[in-house]
Regions:
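Core subunits and conserved enzymes of cellular information-processing
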Residues: 1-131
Length: 131
């Protein structure tokens, strides 16, 4: 697999389209950090790391509106890819839907949102947009 983050986002998108409640994805440290951010910002209901074998899996419980059955995640968009890395400085942090969405940034201080990176005045690689 050449791009594990794109695979992770695609698995989430496919589960949302199929209205699944839970999706299992292969674990990695970067995927764990992205999942934590999605949980903290309220885009997913819950998550659990399952240690089975050398890699393990992440069980992600997707969040749906109880009335309309609409998912909290409208779009997951991969920005940086192995073939074309996208970096940004703290002064040029992307605003996703005028601040309503978020960009997930990989920095020297770890994985964080675009707002957190701008507050700490550090740039990094723009992994994806979530809204």
């Amino acid at each position: 697999m050449t791009d594990p983050i794109a695979d992770y986002l695609t698995r989430l998108r496919n589960a949302i389209q199929a209205k699944h409640r839970v999706v299992e994805v292969p674990a990695s440290n970067l995927k764990k950090e992205i999942t934590k951010i999605l949980f903290e910002k309220g885009y997913i209901l819950n998550y659990k790391f399952v240690e089975d074998g050398p890699q393990g899996t992440i069980k992600v419980a997707l969040k749906y509106d109880s009335v309309n059955k609409v998912n909290a995640i409208k779009k997951l968009e991969r920005v940086s890819s192995p073939g074309l890395r996208r970096y940004t400085g703290y002064k040029d942090m992307p605003r996703v839907i005028n601040g309503l969405g978020l960009a997930i940034i990989s920095t020297s201080k770890g994985v964080m949102t675009n707002k957190e990176a701008a507050e700490l005045k550090i740039g990094g690689e723009v992994l994806c947009y979530v809204y």
